[in-house]
Amino acid sequence: MELSDEMLKEMSYVKISQYRTKVMKALEDDIKIPSKIAKDSDIRQNHISKVLAELRAHELVECINPEVRKGRLYRLTDKGNELVKNIE
């Protein structure tokens, strides 16, 4: 499958950060709260919020219930799903 230039740039953006890569893989095929993402990716929870904000800014993840303060649910966007399938 031929990847667009934009997708290659996004893939590079994710791959240069071990944290971003781990969070993307933790969200593959699942919806999770930040504490579960932290546990599954072996990253301390205080880093997860920053990584999720970065990935949201690039439209790779989305928060399903942004109106709640605790227990926010995150999942990959279509763009994020396409990208994570191409990360080794």
Task: Provide a role label for each language-model segment.
Residues 1-21:
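Short alpha-helical segments that sit at the start of domains
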Residues 18-25, 82:
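Pre-recognition alpha-helix immediately N-terminal to the DNA-recognition helix
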Residues 29-33:
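Short capping segments at the starts of secondary-structure elements
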Residues 36-40:
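A short acidic, leucine-rich amphipathic alpha-helix
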Residues 46:
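Key DNA-contact positions within bacterial/archaeal DNA-binding proteins
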Residues 52-56:
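Short, hydrophobic-biased segments on the C-terminal half of alpha helices
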Residues 59:
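Glycine-centered, phosphate/nucleic-acid-interacting loop/turn motifs that mediate DNA/RNA or nucleotide
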Residues 68-87:
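Basic, amphipathic "hinge/linker" alpha-helix immediately C-terminal to the N-terminal HTH DNA-binding motif
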